[in-house]
Amino acid sequence: MEPNPIFSEFQLEFFKRIKMQPKSIETLNDVSEVMSGCAQIFSFENLDVVANTTEPLNREVIIQQLVNNKQGGLCYKINSVFYYFIKSFGFNIYQVRCCVENQETHDCWQINGAHIINIIEYENKKYLADVAFGCNLSYEPIPFSEEIIESCTGLYRIRKVDNIIRDIKYTYLLEFKKPDSFSPESARLWTNGYAFDPLVKAIDIDENDKIDSHATQIQQLIIDDPTKEFSVKPLATKVVNNESIATLTSNSFTLTNCKTGEKTKVTFDINNEIKQLEQFNQHLISIFNLPPLKFLPKI
């Protein structure tokens, strides 16, 4: 890749958004720096879905929302804006859709194809670059070699698998775990994240940027999901100061130490709707730098 000292408006705005000095993105170390910036800036949140303010998505809309309007989003927005940015520097990067294991019960798989990731081909090797798997973030590309990548949020690896999900041909599995200092002990065991096939590319992104069908399709899958996991209950989560994970729900705010698992929790007054909304918005603004909600949905 040739050095590119002249940056596009989008590139400059993206650098500004993730608080990174403009530079030519040429190596995996450069990509890691971008991933680190994304992890610390973009909130993984579903507030537009909950508030029923979603719109059809394309490159222009996603950039407007996440870069210019300083919003967060779910995987189909955050991973897509990262994809646009890295691709603009000439990287061989493409997207793949995955199936996520239920991260609460770990006893079932969720909607097939409802998570989207980035695959980078660099020096004849493939790497996974996911900046939007909740706060399970590697901060650097993960090689397809079972090499363990460690970040402040945990340890990550990719394993080749067969028949991980019945009747669906997936060939690789992302696994993660917490460090040995983390409590509870069960979190220190390797856990399934999601299954995918790196050869099945999400290639039908409209070249004229009229519609990014994969982002729009996944958004609709989330809205139509009968379990309503991401469509009814407001959620915002992000890494704070590379040491804690902040999680905001309609009922509480929790700060979890990445190394120990120690939690500090603030419970909202659910018996007083006005006060509950005030408490929610206070944290939404101060921790996540997101605009306040007008109401909290009744669940």
From Swiss-Prot:
Which residues participate directly in catalysis?
75 (acyl-thioester intermediate), 115, 130
A Pfam family the protein falls into: Acetyltransf_2
Keyword annotations: Acyltransferase, Transferase
Which reaction does this chain catalyze?
Answer: an arylamine + acetyl-CoA = an N-acetylarylamine + CoA
Instruction: Work out whether the entry's keyword set contains Acyltransferase.
Output: yes
User: Which GO terms label this protein's molecular function in UniProt?
Assistant: arylamine N-acetyltransferase activity
InterPro entries registered for this protein in UniProt: Arylamine_N-AcTrfase, Arylamine_NAT_domain_sf, Papain-like_cys_pep_sf
**Broadest EC class?**
transferase
E.C. number(s) listed in UniProt: 2.3.1.5
Is Membrane given among the entry's keywords? no
Xref: SUPFAM superfamilies: Cysteine proteinases
- Do you know which PANTHER family this protein is assigned to? ARYLAMINE N-ACETYLTRANSFERASE 1-RELATED (PTHR11786:SF9), N-HYDROXYARYLAMINE O-ACETYLTRANSFERASE (PTHR11786)
Q: Which family does it belong to?
A: Belongs to the arylamine N-acetyltransferase family.
The protein's name is Probable arylamine N-acetyltransferase 2
